[in-house]
Swiss-Prot record:
GO BP field: protein repair; response to nitrosative stress; response to oxidative stress
Protein name as it appears in the record: Iron-sulfur cluster repair protein YtfE
Function: Di-iron-containing protein involved in the repair of iron-sulfur clusters damaged by oxidative and nitrosative stress conditions.
UniProt keyword annotations, A-Z: Cytoplasm, Iron, Metal-binding, Stress response
Residues in the signal sequence: none
One term of GO molecular function: metal ion binding
Species assigned in the record: Salmonella typhi
Primary subcellular site in the record, as a coarse category: cytoplasm
Lineage of origin: Bacteria, Pseudomonadati, Pseudomonadota, Gammaproteobacteria, Enterobacterales
Pfam families (alphabetical): Hemerythrin (PF01814), ScdA_N (PF04405)
Gene3D superfamilies named among the record's database cross-references: nmb1532 protein domain like
Amino acid sequence: MAYRDQPLGELALSIPRASALFRQYDMDYCCGGKQTLARAAARHDVDIDIIEAQLAQLAEQPIEKDWRAVPLADIIDHIVVRYHDRHREQLPELILQATKVERVHADKPNVPRGLTKYLTALHEELSSHMMKEEQILFPMIKQGMGRQATGPISVMESEHDEAGELVDVIKHVTQNVTPPPEACTTWKAMYNGINEMIDALMEHISLENNVLFPRALAGE
């Protein structure tokens, strides 16, 4: 099957572990989920035939859960527990680790300068964003008022883009979240944590942008 003309967001939802494959190639399937596989491959200089073959292999596996068929209230409950609560735990710990690494290794050329500042900005951005979702948007959707939520959803999507831009900056200052040879245990653990946080955030944004919001606006 040809996947090149399909949007990344759709492929991430319909093919098991496609999201992990896209992360491997640094393809944005959440905020950039509307771009086709062909366009994303061209932007990242990836051989389209190779990634299509990899997706075909993944597509042979059974999909764990098709969120496109799950009730919206259940999706919202899953988002809050699986992602909102997790981000609230992850980011303060990562900020503490970044503060330590930047202080202890200040003289090292590969130290991720500014990482604490950018993680703090992301934490503040997401804290405000998630509170607005939980207090305003999610109750509207649960009450069947998704069609009237065009304004709040537009704001949330814009804030998703802003969070994605901060993630790009974090990836830049950490050399794509790759620890250098001299990295200590804390440094390596922090980068593992950052990768986990980015994975969770991309899954979170993808589920909202590509499933929850379109279905809510359609009046489900």
